[in-house]
From Swiss-Prot:
Molecular function as annotated in GO: ion channel regulator activity; toxin activity
Full protein name: Precursor protein UG
Compartment(s) of residence: Secreted; Nematocyst
Similarity remark: Belongs to the sea anemone BBH family.
Leader sequence residues: 1-19
GO CC terms: extracellular region; nematocyst
Record carries keyword Ribonucleoprotein: no
Top-rank taxon, per record: Eukaryota
Organism: Urticina grebelnyi
Record has Secreted as a keyword: yes
Swiss-Prot/TrEMBL domain comment: Pi-AnmTX Ugr 9a-1, AnmTX Ugr 9a-2 and AnmTX Ugr 9a-3 have a structural fold called the boundless beta-hairpin since its beta-hairpin is not stabilized by disulfide bonds.
Amino acid sequence: MERILLCFIVATLVAISMANPRPISIDPPCWTCYYRDSSGNCAFDAIACGGARKRVPKPISIDPPCRTCYYRDSSGNCVYDAFGCGGARKRVPKPISIDPPCRTCYYRDSSGNCVYDAFGCGGARKRVPKPISIDPPCRFCYHRDGSGNCVYDAYGCGAVRK
């Protein structure tokens, strides 16, 4: 019984192959990722060739590509893309302010004045900067007295106290 079934399957396969013989082709086979189109030319098959790992060639564009952090808008101009440029590591440019920034340990209050911030100034290890003085510093061996004048200081300049 098995022999009869096996002979029947073989006879069926032979009959099918005889009914649809392969045409004899004069053209050589196409390369990998190519197929023969209706005109007989080898054409690239981007969809069936290698799946996602195969890169499809980009279409040729008349416009050159935009620089990093820029994209081409609908009118064809390169426009800066602040949000899509490098993620969180990329700093967005700060808005231009008319007021200059406050010094260290100071902050700008609601009226626009720089106010000293004792609590937010780095703790005990942070030295508070000295206030800016209009008077220039005194020369070596001199110090500024209570009236703001530079006075010679003999003891602060290597003299021996009695």
